[in-house]
Design a protein with these regions (language model features):
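Amphipathic alpha-helical segments of the small helical/lid subdomains adjacent to P-loop NTPase cores
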Residues: 2-9, 126-135, 292-346, 351-355
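Walker A/P-loop-proximal flanking segment of P-loop NTPase domains
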Residues: 1-96
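Short amphipathic alpha-helical interaction segments
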Residues: 413-429, 433-436, 491
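Winged-helix-like regulatory helical subdomains adjacent to P-loop NTPase cores
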Residues: 331-420
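P-loop NTPase catalytic cores that bind/hydrolyze ATP
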Residues: 94-116, 129-131, 222, 327-361, ...
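Short, amphipathic alpha-helical interaction segments positioned at domain boundaries
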Residues: 446-484
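The catalytic "switch" region of P-loop NTPases
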Residues: 204-326
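P-loop NTPase nucleotide-binding core
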Residues: 53-222, 474-480, 484, 496, ...
Length: 508
């Protein structure tokens, strides 16, 4: 019997970290910050930008907006696949590129719903029926059954019956246009006429969107929500935030487009693009939200997941620990996850993997598998994020609080300027943060004081300390801003009060 069954689960609860790969996400979804604000009011839709780190819940939020589409009466159109020709580069990506992709998806979603009401299109007058036929020829003309299925996978907000309908009625290599023309009794348009009409269409993309919105409203929807996600995951953007923003810039900076009546453009974006986006941003016109999960919220995420995968039998990791947990394991996992729902799953998966290696027949998690799994995760995420050399430097420093002079004189034995440059690099990657200044007897002026703020790296610095002692000695929640500080206050020089890394207020 698999370990997950021994532990009381019906399936592996930590096998997937990508929200798009979790078919039952709604069963254990915990609304992230600003969930209601991002959905907004479909009767008066508006554009919004959601910024979050990778693994911060952007795609889960998008999925749940899709899930609520019928309840709120809007048509969800996901746009998370960006295809490029062989010679195309980011400089070639224009507003027209995006609008053509968006119109294709809206049209397919509209026609899918029409499959339930084919008489609606037959009742339209001849000019409107020809207009729809032209849309079909222009935007879906090259679709065959295989390409159609790829596009339908992207439109995750469509009820599954529509995907099943098209799969059953369009052959793998069959022309989708022919099926549509026959099903809806639409006019066939000759190739020369199509080319001439296409030329006219390309000059009126926004008018086309307004026209499609009118058709969609005839189906009973209040608005169209365009949900743009994953622009940082293409072959042309990768890990480059500047390239990522360049891809979406023609779309996100067009305020006329984003303000189109009947449309709600929702952007789910990697937060590393923010410095570049800020140059164009108009927060007075486009609402902007940052997803920042508290530890308590992550504990709810973890608990709901455990319950969903166990039929309600398992509610916490601590309950799975053999001989009782000497500390709150769920809180520790969510503390070290650094505000990331995905990291919560990654830590739990590491614990599960270590336990399976130790004893796959166990019905409880051993304390050693929990501690080792957490350390394995910390090593992996720290190395992936900052590189092996930086991790070695942090462990060489041996503490999370320091001044430039301390590192220069007591640790690395180099000039202060060399350390200053190194610290600037750590600050740029959000590994280290300045937490005010301190006074010391050896300096006439206050010295900048720095703290390692990535909890995974702090755990590696103190890896020889038992987890329960690590939490007892270093974990200092701030009563003002709820920041979970991990610091040994003994490292604050005499006469200097320990302060919070988040708000800078005194911790005592």
């Amino acid at each position: 019997m698999p370990l997950f069954e021994n532990l009381g689960f019906t399936s592996h609860p930590f096998a997937k970290t990508n929200a798009d790969e979790e078919p039952n996400l709604a069963d254990y979804f915990v609304p992230p910050p600003f969930f209601d604000a991002v959905i907004g009011d479909p009767s008066t839709p508006s554009a919004s930008v959601v910024l979050a780190p990778r693994g911060g819940g952007k795609t889960a939020l998008r999925r749940m907006i899709e899930e609520n589409a019928i309840k709120y009466r809007f048509l969800p159109v996901s746009y998370d696949r960006f295809e490029f020709s062989t010679e195309q580069n980011l400089e070639d990506v224009t507003l027209q590129y995006h609008l053509r992709n968006i119109i294709s998806r809206i049209l397919l979603a509209y026609l899918s719903y029409l499959a339930d009401f084919p008489d609606l299109i037959r009742k339209l007058d001849k000019p409107n029926r020809r207009h729809i036929s032209l849309f079909v020829h222009t935007y879906l003309g090259d679709l065959t059954g295989d390409k159609l299925q790829d596009l339908l996978k992207e439109l995750k907000g469509l009820p599954s019956r529509f995907r099943d309908f098209w799969r059953d009625n369009v052959g793998f290599l069959e022309s989708f246009v022919n099926i549509l023309l026959n099903k809806f009794d639409l006019e066939r348009i000759d190739f020369p006429d199509i080319k001439q009409e296409e030329k006219n269409l390309t000059e009126t993309y926004k008018h086309q969107l307004e026209y499609l919105c009118g058709l969609v409203r005839n189906l009973g929807f209040s608005a169209i929500y365009v949900l743009l996600d994953k622009p940082d995951e293409t072959e042309l953007t990768g890990n480059d935030p500047v390239a990522t923003y360049q891809l979406i810039r023609p779309l996100i900076r067009d305020l006329e487009l984003l303000g189109l009546e009947g449309f709600g453009f929702k952007f789910f974006l990697w937060d590393q693009i923010e410095p570049t986006y800020r140059l164009d941003a108009r927060p007075d016109r486009v609402h902007q939200y940052k997803l920042n999960w508290s530890r308590e919220a992550l504990q709810r995420v973890l608990s709901e997941r455990l319950k969903a995968f166990s039929g309600g039998k398992v509610t916490s990791l601590s309950a799975l620990c053999e001989n009782g947990a000497p500390y709150d394991i769920d809180a520790a996992v969510c503390l070290l996850a650094n505000h990331s729902p995905r990291n919560v799953i990654r830590i739990c998966e590491r614990i599960y993997a270590v336990q399976a290696e130790q004893d796959a027949t166990a019905s409880r998690l051993s304390l050693s598998s929990i501690d080792q799994g957490i350390l394995n995760y910390c090593e992996q995420v720290a190395t992936d994020t900052y590189g092996e050399e930086v991790v070695r430097e942090m462990q060489r420093i041996g503490r999370e609080l320091f001044t430039i002079n301390y590192l220069a004189n007591d640790v690395f034995k180099v000039q202060a300027n060399s350390i200053r440059n190194r610290i600037n690099g750590w600050v740029a990657t959000a590994l280290v943060k300045q937490v005010g200044t301190v006074t010391v007897p050896t300096s006439k002026r206050p010295l900048n004081f720095y703290c390692v703020i990535d909890p995974a790296v702090v755990r590696l610095i103190y890896r020889r300390v038992k987890m329960e002692d690590f939490l007892k000695d270093l974990w200092l929640p701030c009563e003002f801003c709820a920041t979970d500080n991990l610091m040994d206050i003994e490292h604050f020089p005499d006469g200097n009060s320990p302060v919070c890394c988040g708000c800078g207020r005194d911790l005592f």
